[in-house]
């Protein structure tokens, strides 16, 4: 049986999904919230915090020791204070929402005189303040300086070791040069690379390259050790006659050409010149061939593997790695050498690269090698042994400067084929040798290079990790200053507080949150854009890629993106592919790699057991698609199944499948999963569709989509714009700005308040100037459960995301007005305010302290008519509710003017009338051009120490009254609850003492009615246990009263204190204007399928094409916009939308005709459960009252959900719905011309489509100017709307006039109409005087030209006759 929540049962969305939901959509913001919680560990006790986030940052820096190591500052733990203001207050005051961080430290001082380290004293610290740490709001944002910001997660290259090649680009020969790179989380990069001559080099931090053997030698390896580690050996025996025998190991020769006859038992097994195949090798092993006589040519040219030493004299005959010649072999015979070893080097997987490199290496000792590295890192400085050693040790072997991190070590060990995933954060000798070995193996053809775009090699760095890095930088800066001060700590008796300077830590954190590239101004256009912004993954930013350098491969969709990053949603333009969106079900694992859920398949049966796999693990398994056909037991019905294995799509037998996708929408992001019939749209248009949904402006009346995907509710619930019940209960009271809930008894903690008050956000400005407004959905007496929706926010309708409006659309041309994607709309759409939006503009007026005196905000403004001041109050600030237009004064402000010498008459007037108009000028805040609206809010901020004006006091009183009202309601409900419990306790009890009653009487209702509830607590019963309970209740009531009173006083004190304003600012007034914008020509609109266009004309309703029943269409779109764009989803949406509205219309008709409830239930059951394969809706679970309410809400249309890749089928669903709605199954009908009444020739596709109005409004773009500002240098008009610019007659326009020889026009354009300053003022004068003469002068641009030529050192001047 289906259970519906309070809001779900009011409007049930019919779902066409044929597959059961195995895994609910996870909380969409969990990545941000979990990451930051891990960083703070705010609610974890100090002793039990894990080593991550802040804790790890502190532990990595502390203890800080003095230079002589006799004093050390140790870290004990940290805790957070209470934030000074809550989120809303921070937004209003323009401050950061943060909590003070306090750290407990201890100072340990050791005894200098004792030989062993002996503690002399310990200075325990009370907590030390370490700056404010911004807190995350419940919705995953930060409030920084009053504005909401989001920290976008970064996709960066995982630390570890990577093997690659240059793809033949590095050298003109086109030879592939292999390389390896060890990337730490923190520290120097180490690159190993081959050059064209097959020598191996290394680079540290991309500097000059050195031979790899220098690095190996600096690690302490000798020549002999290097050869032993990297090469196999061949042993040769010499007899006195000079015959050479090879100790034969057949495996060493596999795949080579035999350079001599290989003989066994007197027969030739492999003749010279034949390839030694694996068959021959097997034969030789079977025959146990142990030695072969080889010709001298075979040995000549080989390299000695070990030093050859004369055993008698101890003299070195030949050093290892020397080439053997015939002369040397003869000498060996003479010296009686019986045996020598050579390096096994051949073309067949045993390259001699390292030996070649070693021969070029001129260093011989470890010290020389380290000195060479020192010279490379610090050119120009003479290397000493100490300096060289300390630099080399610090590069890769010092934990303070080098850290591979847990991820890096895991990736490193995996890459080298080691079993364990844990290990040290620094490199070891074995690590570097292992990397060189693998690089040589790859060069020899064993093993492959890494794909750096594979999501197993890129990881997510979330908010918490980035904040930790910023904090660590601050701590490192702090460490330097502490180290210097520690020496004085003992002698001067300093405490930890004296040692620590908070500034560097606070500055580092503040810099990260306010100016990092990844700390972005939140996109608050609508709820979807907020959610998407928090789920965005960027490859840009510090330590990431740059737009210019990123190539095509990085931006492209990779097979590992499946279920992790959305292949559709990414911006168009220079950032394409660099900014991605998290897929619906994706999450990060402990190492920061993205993982996606799969259902486990056991013995060919799909189970409901969910396992998350990262890209590293996924390639090992065979994974079936979510649309594979299963029987009722979960077994695959088809023999061959479409699967993914090793990043390839293949068909596999069902017995080999190990996992199966969780859901068809697994691969897309939240925005793409909101597009119905996405599977029928071309990818490019789907990309535009998902991006444009984020630009939809919340309309005045939100309208749920008739055709959705079922994700609308999930997005709205997780976005944070709705008000959800924290605890279940009964609605006590509701008005437009707050909801009071009396909480269920079983959800109230002992002694807790049984009341929740939700203050709604009313007409508040968002970051994008759209309007945030919440409207209640509940009525007094409603019963709600935890998590139910109490109030809708912007762009939500009954708890579902509603970005646009359902409008009746026809696809047909109409007089060329829908040419090139133009959109023709009916006047009705505009009249009914379907796409009317409210925008809130913030205008600020600042009164500063100037040199000539303070600026003043007042209504006493010089030279201003009375009528202009009509909308201002006595303090000079506009009233809330005033309707203002361009040029109106919002805040009256006067600024002192410089004193000028006054004439005797002025002095006399001033002496008589005290006239002060002359020494101040009007600098009021006025409504800017092209704006008109209603004042919805005014905020006054006053500096501390300056008296607040009347308006500021009135605003303060309003805020305090609102808090008082909340507290009064909380007390009322709490008291009523306690009194109710007291009454139940007292009734029927034997009295010991009570007014007007004798001892022994029982308490009855009459007694309770005669006395006040406060008196009940003074009654005494004969049962002492009851008296104790009464006393406890009385105490609880008093405690709660005091607690709420204290809270009220605290809030009151906050409001009455002054504001923290910028230096020199005395007062600041912010005025908020609500601007109503109707849909008009020039506005951009779009559907959800990337079908965008601009409104071209608003046509009267009577002229619009209409249907046979007389219904005029709302919008006419061009049919030519569909075939070439290949977004057929919009046509299917049109048909299903028509069916949905038609079904609603039929239901409304039945209700109006008074059909019995049984018939309505039967009809709706036929609609909701028409296809047994689809999700079943249990309408019988609804009571009659709930059912009637559902019917009333479905009159406008029955909302449908067609989930992506699992939606409505054309024949069995779409046509069935159209038939049920009694509409043509083709989805087309005849239309009539509204102007002539004639029928159009052929049928037209008509239906309901969900259209959005985008944030590109014509009002923000259109702009006109007569006169305005000019550029100072050229005296030509400025450009652009923001500067109130105009048209400039530029060089190309001049060429056009020159081409026509229009010399007089040209002269006029270049002089009096443009930048001839004197000429244009004279011309104005002449026009006023009626004298129509032009006197052209010298254009200012000419002066600019002469100045520029003079700057080149050429003296140029204009001689005038």
From Swiss-Prot:
Q: Keyword set for this entry?
A: DNA-directed RNA polymerase, Nucleotidyltransferase, Transcription, Transferase
Record GO biological process: DNA-templated transcription
* CDD domains according to UniProt: RNA_pol_B_RPB2
EC code(s) of this entry: 2.7.7.6
Q: Do you know which SUPFAM superfamilies this protein is assigned to?
A: beta and beta-prime subunits of DNA dependent RNA-polymerase
Q: Which PROSITE patterns match?
A: RNA_POL_BETA (PS01166)
Cellular component GO terms held in the UniProt record: DNA-directed RNA polymerase complex
Recorded catalytic activity of this chain's protein: RNA(n) + a ribonucleoside 5'-triphosphate = RNA(n+1) + diphosphate
Amino-acid biosynthesis: present as a keyword of the record? Answer: no
Q: Which GO terms describe its molecular function?
A: DNA binding; DNA-directed RNA polymerase activity; ribonucleoside binding
Q: Indicate whether Membrane appears among the record's keywords.
A: no
Gene3D superfamilies assigned: 2.40.50.100, 2.40.50.150, 3.90.1100.10, DNA-directed RNA polymerase, subunit 2, domain 6, RNA polymerase alpha subunit dimerisation domain, RNA polymerase Rpb2, domain 2
What does the UniProt record say this protein does? DNA-dependent RNA polymerase catalyzes the transcription of DNA into RNA using the four ribonucleoside triphosphates as substrates.
Q: Sorted alphabetically, which PANTHER family does this protein's record hold?
A: DNA-DIRECTED RNA POLYMERASE I SUBUNIT 2
Q: How does it assemble?
A: The RNAP catalytic core consists of 2 alpha, 1 beta, 1 beta' and 1 omega subunit. When a sigma factor is associated with the core the holoenzyme is formed, which can initiate transcription.
Q: Which family, according to the similarity comment?
A: Belongs to the RNA polymerase beta chain family.
Protein name from the UniProt record: DNA-directed RNA polymerase subunit beta
This chain's source organism reads Dichelobacter nodosus (strain VCS1703A)
Gene responsible for this protein: rpoB
């Amino acid at each position: 049986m289906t259970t519906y929540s309070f809001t779900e049962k009011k409007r049930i969305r019919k779902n066409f999904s044929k597959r059961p939901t195995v895994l609910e959509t996870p909380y969409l913001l969990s990545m941000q919230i979990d990451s930051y919680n891990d960083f703070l560990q705010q609610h974890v006790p100090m002793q039990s915090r894990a080593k991550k986030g802040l804790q790890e940052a502190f532990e990595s820096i502390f203890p800080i020791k003095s230079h002589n190591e006799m004093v050390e500052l140790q870290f004990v733990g940290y805790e957070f204070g209470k934030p000074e203001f809550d989120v809303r207050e921070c937004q209003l005051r323009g401050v950061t929402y943060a909590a003070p961080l306090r750290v407990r430290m201890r100072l340990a001082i050791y005894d200098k005189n004792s030989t062993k380290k002996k503690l002399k004293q310990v200075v325990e610290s009370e907590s030390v303040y370490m700056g404010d740490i911004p807190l995350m709001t419940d919705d995953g944002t930060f409030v920084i300086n009053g504005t909401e910001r989001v920290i976008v997660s970064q996709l960066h290259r995982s630390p570890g070791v990577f093997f690659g090649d240059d793809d033949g680009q590095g050298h003109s020969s086109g030879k592939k040069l292999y390389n390896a790179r060890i990337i730490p989380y923190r520290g120097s990069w180490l690159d190993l690379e081959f050059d064209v001559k097959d020598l191996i080099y290394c680079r540290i931090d991309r500097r000059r390259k050195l031979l790899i053997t220098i690095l190996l030698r600096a690690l302490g390896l000798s020549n002999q050790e290097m050869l032993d580690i990297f090469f196999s050996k061949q042993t040769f025996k010499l007899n006195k006659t000079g015959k050479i025998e090879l100790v034969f190991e057949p495996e060493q020769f596999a795949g080579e050409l035999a350079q001599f006859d290989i003989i066994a038992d007197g027969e030739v097994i492999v003749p010279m010149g034949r390839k030694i195949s694996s068959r021959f090798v097997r034969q030789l092993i079977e025959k146990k061939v142990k030695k072969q006589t080889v010709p001298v040519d075979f040995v000549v040219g080989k390299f000695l593997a070990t030093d050859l030493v004369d055993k008698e004299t101890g003299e070195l005959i030949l050093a290892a790695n020397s080439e053997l010649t015939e002369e040397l072999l003869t000498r060996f015979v003479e010296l009686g050498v019986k045996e020598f070893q050579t390096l096994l080097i051949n073309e067949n997987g045993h390259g001699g690269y390292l030996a070649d490199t070693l021969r070029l290496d001129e260093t011989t000792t470890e010290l020389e090698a380290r000195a060479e590295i020192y010279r490379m890192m610090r050119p120009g400085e003479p290397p000493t042994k100490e300096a060289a050693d300390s630099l080399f040790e610090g590069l890769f072997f010092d934990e303070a400067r080098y850290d591979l991190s847990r991820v890096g070590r895991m990736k490193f060990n995996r890459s080298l084929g080691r079993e364990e995933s844990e290990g040290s954060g620094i490199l070891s000798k074995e690590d570097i040798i292992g990397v060189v070995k693998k690089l040589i193996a790859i060069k020899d053809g064993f093993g492959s290079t890494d794909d750096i775009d594979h999501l197993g090699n890129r990881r997510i760095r979330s908010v918490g990790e980035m904040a930790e890095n910023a904090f660590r930088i601050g701590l490192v800066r702090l460490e330097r200053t502490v180290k210097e001060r520690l020496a004085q700590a003992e002698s001067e008796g300093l405490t930890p507080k004296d040692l620590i300077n908070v500034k560097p830590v606070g500055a580092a954190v503040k810099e990260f949150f306010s100016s990092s590239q990844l700390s972005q101004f939140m996109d608050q256009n609508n709820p979807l854009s907020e959610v998407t912004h928090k789920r965005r993954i960027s490859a840009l930013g510090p330590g990431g890629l740059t737009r210019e350098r990123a190539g095509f491969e990085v931006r492209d969709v990779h097979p590992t993106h499946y279920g992790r990053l959305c292949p559709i949603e990414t911006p168009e333009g220079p950032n394409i592919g660099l900014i991605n969106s998290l897929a619906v079900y994706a999450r990060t694992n402990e190492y920061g790699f993205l993982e996606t859920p799969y259902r486990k398949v056991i013995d060919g049966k799909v189970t409901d057991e969910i396992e998350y796999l990262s890209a590293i693990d996924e390639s090992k398994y065979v994974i079936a698609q979510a649309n594979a056909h299963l029987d009722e037991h979960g077994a695959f019905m088809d023999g061959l199944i479409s699967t993914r294995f090793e990043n390839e799509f293949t068909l596999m037998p069902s017995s080999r499948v190990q996992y199966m996708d969780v859901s068809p929408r697994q691969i897309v992001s939240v925005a793409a999963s909101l597009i119905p019939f996405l599977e029928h749209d071309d990818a490019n248009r789907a990309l535009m569709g998902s991006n444009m949904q984020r630009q939809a402006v919340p309309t005045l009346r939100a309208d749920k989509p008739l055709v959705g995907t079922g994700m609308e509710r999930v997005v709205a619930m997780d976005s944070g714009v709705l008000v959800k019940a924290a605890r279940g209960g009964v609605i006590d009271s509701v008005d437009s700005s707050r909801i009071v809930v009396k909480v269920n008894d079983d959800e109230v903690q002992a002694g807790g308040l049984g009341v929740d008050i939700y203050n709604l956000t009313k007409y508040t400005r968002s970051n994008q100037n759209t309007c945030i407004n919440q409207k209640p959905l509940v009525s007094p007496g409603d019963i709600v459960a935890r998590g139910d929706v109490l109030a809708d926010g912007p762009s939500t309708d009954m708890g579902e995301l509603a970005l646009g409006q359902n409008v009746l659309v026809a696809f047909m041309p109409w007089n060329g007005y829908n040419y090139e994607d133009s959109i023709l709309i009916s006047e009705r759409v505009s009249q009914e305010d379907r796409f009317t939006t409210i925008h809130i503009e913030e205008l600020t007026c600042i009164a500063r302290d100037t040199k000539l005196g303070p600026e003043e905000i007042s209504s006493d403004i010089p030279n201003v008519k009375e009528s202009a001041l009509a909308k201002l109050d006595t303090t000079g600030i506009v009233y809330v509710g005033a309707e203002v237009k361009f040029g109106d004064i919002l805040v009256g402000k006067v600024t002192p003017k410089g004193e000028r010498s006054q004439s005797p008459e002025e002095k006399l007037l001033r002496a008589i009338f005290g006239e002060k108009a002359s020494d101040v000028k009007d600098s009021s805040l006025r409504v800017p051009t092209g704006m008109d609206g209603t004042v919805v809010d005014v905020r006054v901020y006053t500096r501390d120490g300056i008296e607040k004006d009347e308006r500021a006091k009135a605003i303060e009183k309003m805020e305090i009254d609102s808090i008082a009202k909340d507290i009064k309601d909380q007390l009322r409900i709490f008291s009523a609850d306690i009194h109710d419990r007291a009454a139940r306790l007292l009734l029927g009890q034997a009295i010991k003492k009570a007014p007007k009653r004798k001892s022994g009487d029982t308490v009855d209702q009459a007694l309770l009615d005669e006395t006040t509830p406060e008196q009940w607590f003074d009654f005494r019963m004969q049962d002492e246990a009851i008296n104790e309970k009464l006393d406890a209740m009385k105490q609880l009531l008093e405690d709660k009263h005091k607690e709420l009173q204290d809270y009220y006083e605290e809030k009151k004190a906050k409001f009455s204190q002054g504001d923290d304003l910028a230096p020199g600012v005395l007062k600041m007034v912010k005025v908020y204007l609500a601007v109503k914008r109707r849909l008009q020509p020039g506005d951009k609109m779009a559907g959800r399928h990337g079908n965008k266009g601009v409104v071209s004309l608003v046509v009267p309703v009577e002229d619009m094409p209409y249907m046979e029943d007389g219904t005029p269409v709302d919008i006419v779109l061009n049919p030519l916009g569909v075939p070439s764009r290949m977004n057929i989803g919009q046509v299917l949406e049109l048909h299903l939308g028509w069916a949905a509205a038609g079904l609603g219309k039929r239901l409304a008709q039945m209700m109006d005709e008074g059909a019995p409830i049984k018939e309505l239930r039967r009809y709706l059951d036929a609609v909701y459960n028409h296809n047994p394969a689809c999700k079943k809706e249990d309408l019988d679970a609804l009571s009659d009252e709930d059912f009637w309410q559902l019917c009333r809400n479905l009159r406008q249309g029955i909302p449908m959900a067609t989930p992506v890749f699992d939606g409505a089928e054309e024949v069995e669903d779409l046509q069935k719905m159209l038939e049920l709605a009694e509409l043509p199954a083709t989805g087309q009908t005849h239309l009539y011309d509204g102007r002539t009444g004639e029928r159009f020739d052929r049928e037209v596709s008509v239906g309901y489509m969900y259209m959005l109005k985008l944030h590109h409004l014509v009002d923000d773009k259109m702009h006109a100017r007569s006169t305005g500002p000019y550029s100072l240098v050229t005296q030509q008009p400025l450009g652009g709307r923001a500067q109130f610019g105009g048209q400039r007659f530029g060089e190309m326009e001049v060429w056009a006039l020159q081409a026509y020889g229009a010399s007089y026009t040209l002269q006029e354009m270049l002089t009096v109409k443009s930048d001839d300053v004197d000429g244009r003022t004279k011309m104005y004068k002449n026009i006023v005087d009626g004298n129509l003469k032009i006197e052209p002068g010298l254009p200012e641009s000419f002066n600019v030209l002469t100045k520029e030529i003079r700057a080149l050192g050429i003296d140029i001047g204009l001689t005038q006759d």
